[in-house]
């Protein structure tokens, strides 16, 4: 990301609300990258390093992030009309959050089955 001109702005840990199973982690890292000119819109919302947001799987896909958590990041790091790049699109939770918060998005997913799942999810909005 550094080579593309983006800096690591913030790193958080998301504590998932439910235990998926004993062989999987019940937390995930949240990495927020942006340009050097970035100014935080809500410093208070980002003071805690561990975030607690409910986890909801979608269509058997358990790796998706919480929509509330994604909205928290999008609304802090972008303005209405800006583009959000999601290089791990998954089932499209970030893209749905972008639509709901009036941001544009560019999603990348290498797994064809997961990508088609995301496209069908987005097509009903």
Show the residue positions of the predicted features.
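Conserved phosphoryl-transfer catalytic core
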Residues: 123-124
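Core catalytic lobe of class I
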Residues: 1-115
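Conserved SAM-binding loop
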Residues: 118-119
């Amino acid at each position: 990301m550094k080579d593309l001109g983006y800096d690591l702005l913030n790193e958080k840990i998301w504590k998932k609300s439910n235990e998926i199973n004993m062989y999987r982690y019940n937390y995930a890292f949240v990495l927020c990258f942006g340009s050097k000119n970035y100014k935080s819109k809500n410093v208070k919302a980002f003071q805690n390093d561990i975030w607690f947001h409910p986890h909801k799987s979608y269509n058997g896909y358990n790796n998706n992030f919480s929509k509330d958590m994604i909205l928290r990041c999008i609304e802090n790091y972008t303005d209405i009309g800006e583009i959000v790049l999601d290089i791990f699109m998954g089932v499209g939770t970030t893209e749905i959050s972008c639509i709901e918060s009036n941001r544009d998005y560019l999603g990348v997913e290498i797994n064809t089955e997961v990508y088609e799942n995301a496209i069908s999810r987005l097509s009903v909005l």
